[in-house]
Amino acid sequence: MITVRETADFEKWMRGLKDRKTRLVINARIRRISVGNFGNTKSVGGNVSELVIDYGPGYRVYFTRRGREIIILLCGGDKSSQSRDIETAKQIAENFKEA
């Protein structure tokens, strides 16, 4: 099983989602990651990858790996804010320090 951790930025983004079903769909994808099923992902550079969620406006969750077991969820967004979200995720990954 893969350990999945969330940054404060990601938690804030999730709390800001108004639609309960959207949160459920995203959480289901995160649970699949924890068992090794990443689905539709792609690298966006800077040791950051994008998890594409084919629901609503095309939600994205950005993550990085630390070692073999830990996935850090950096931030999220949708297709309309993709470029800005990628830059934010790269910055968070660069500044991330192990607690």
Can you say where each PLM-predicted feature lies in the sequence?
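Short, surface-exposed beta-strand/loop micro-motifs that present aromatic residues
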Residues: 60-64
